[in-house]
Amino acid sequence: MGQIKVRDIMTTQVITVLETDTIRDATITLAVDTLSGAPVIDDDYHLCGIISEMDILNLIMKYEAELKVENPVLHLLAFPMDTKFDDPDLEAAAAKFSKTPVKDIMIRDVITTTPDAEIVDTLALMLEKDVNRVPVLEKGVLVGIVTRSDIVFSIYKRKI
């Protein structure tokens, strides 16, 4: 049996975020599509980085130190993003958080693979670097993504 290539199991309809999107936009994308992270691209589908739930949560925690309100993180987490707050400092922080560009908090140093790479090698890299997803690039353009879930599903389907 031949080696399984990344192209055999990768997802080709990749949900992405633009580097110019706001954190509000990215949060909506991740929440609606129930994703823990997504590739960040430019207008030409070139990979710029990755944004994850952790990046967004770290940004929320940043405001903990800046605000004088008791438990500001609870305020930011407990209400929808479009909520207007009575406290002007909290309102300003919520607006600043929502309008922060994705490019300001995304991870830029991203592990990538190609469609012709062997999935076993990609999995080993994912485990070594402790990443959930690896963008698949062809000539610098995002053509897919392979996730731990894709690999587990392939094991279930006996592709691996």
Residue ranges and their predicted role:
Residues M1-T29, L35, V40-D42, L47-C48, ...:
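Bateman/CBS regulatory modules and CBS-like beta-alpha motifs in cytosolic regions of diverse proteins
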Residues G49-L57, L137, G144-I151:
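Short hydrophobic beta-strand motif reused across regulatory alpha/beta modules
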Residues L127-K129, R133-V134, R148-K159:
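Gly/Ser-rich helix-loop-strand patches that form or flank binding pockets
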Residues L57-V73, V152-I160:
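A short, polar/charged loop-to-alpha-helix boundary motif
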Residues S36-K68:
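Generic detector of contiguous secondary-structure segments
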Residues D33-T34, D130:
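Short, basic and Ser/Thr-rich N-terminal targeting/leader segments
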